[in-house]
């Protein structure tokens, strides 16, 4: 295992950031999922040795991360928020960090990292001129310039446009394909689905679930859903839906029907025929429960 945590706790005064987290992370790519404020960043900061746990233990690549400079150079870290010297060029920034990490040929290492993130054409421009996507690539370049065994990425895809997101996903995958490991955090399930099937779910500082992403998808599909169905004749549709065993609660207004169902898969499968038989046209279907927040709430309340 590349990471092992046992009864890990972190608190800031009365605020609990991590609450008795025990987990093991194998080699490869692992997604760390949770809403904002879940404890993901605190977990990552302990993992890279930037912060000490309040109690419990964390081992990374077999070693304790706190106050361990030899381990630190085996890890690459890309923070969520920018921390650039804006007046530097991308090349100067990466070269400086390579030097701090003790890389022997800093210029050559920086050039390799810049080429790897496809920033050679803009490497000698000042960072203050970079777009968000370019800044993200430079942040990833500094995280890999010393060729770490483990790459830790905190919300690397946040705010990126679709094209940049796909480019970043390809870079992360290529790093892992070289036999190294990645831990990447996100609060968006479909982002992680494009990277890996191995995920860890954290909510309010607690480990909620871990394992194959398909199992998490099953949780999303199986937990009770509230479904909004916009239709041209909501009253007629509501009357038809009220007879269905999958529906446990129903209400409607002049534009839509809201249904509560413990069996969303069966409900979605039957809805088209029910609407057709009721002589109503379904215009839109949506569910506020088809997301990670709802899964976290469901798991922590059951």
Language model features with spans:
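ABC transporter nucleotide-binding domain
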Residues: 169-262
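A generic structural signal for secondary-structure junctions
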Residues: 102, 139, 218-222, 246, ...
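Alpha-helix N-cap/helix-start and coil->helix boundary motif
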Residues: 9, 65, 91, 189, ...
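A short linear hydrophobic-aromatic micro-motif
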Residues: 118, 246-251, 281-286
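ABC transporter nucleotide-binding domains
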Residues: 2-5, 10-203, 208-209
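C-terminal coupling/interaction segments
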Residues: 263-302
């Amino acid at each position: 295992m590349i990471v092992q945590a046992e009864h890990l706790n972190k608190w800031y005064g009365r605020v609990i950031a991590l609450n008795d987290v025990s987990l093991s992370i194998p080699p490869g790519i692992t997604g760390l999922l949770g809403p904002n404020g879940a404890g993901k960043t605190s977990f990552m900061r302990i993992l890279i040795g930037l912060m000490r746990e309040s109690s419990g233990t964390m081992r990374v690549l077999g070693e304790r991360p706190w106050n361990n400079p030899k381990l630190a150079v085996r890890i690459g870290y890309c923070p969520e928020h920018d921390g650039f010297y804006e007046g530097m060029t991308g090349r100067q920034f990466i070269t400086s960090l390579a030097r701090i990490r003790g890389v022997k040929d800093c210029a050559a290492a920086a050039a390799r990292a810049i080429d790897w993130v496809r920033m050679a054409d803009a490497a000698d421009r000042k960072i203050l001129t970079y777009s968000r996507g370019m800044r993200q690539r430079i942040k990833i370049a500094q995280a890999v310039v010393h060729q770490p065994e483990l790459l830790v990425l905190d919300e690397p895809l946040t705010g990126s446009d679709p094209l940049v997101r796909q480019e970043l996903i390809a870079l992360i995958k290529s790093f892992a394909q070289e036999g190294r490991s990645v831990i990447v955090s996100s609060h968006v399930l479909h982002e992680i689905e494009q990277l890996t099937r191995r995920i860890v779910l954290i909510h309010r500082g607690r480990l909620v679930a871990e394992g194959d992403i398909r199992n998490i998808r099953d949780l999303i599909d199986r937990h009770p859903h509230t479904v909004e169905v916009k239709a041209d004749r909501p009253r007629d549709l509501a009357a038809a839906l009220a007879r269905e065993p999958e529906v446990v609660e129903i209400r409607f207004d002049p534009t839509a029907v809201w249904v509560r169902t413990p069996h969303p898969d069966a409900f979605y499968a039957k809805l088209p025929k029910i609407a057709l038989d009721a002589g109503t046209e379904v215009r839109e279907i949506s569910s506020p429960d088809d997301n990670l927040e709802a899964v976290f709430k469901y798991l922590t309340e059951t």
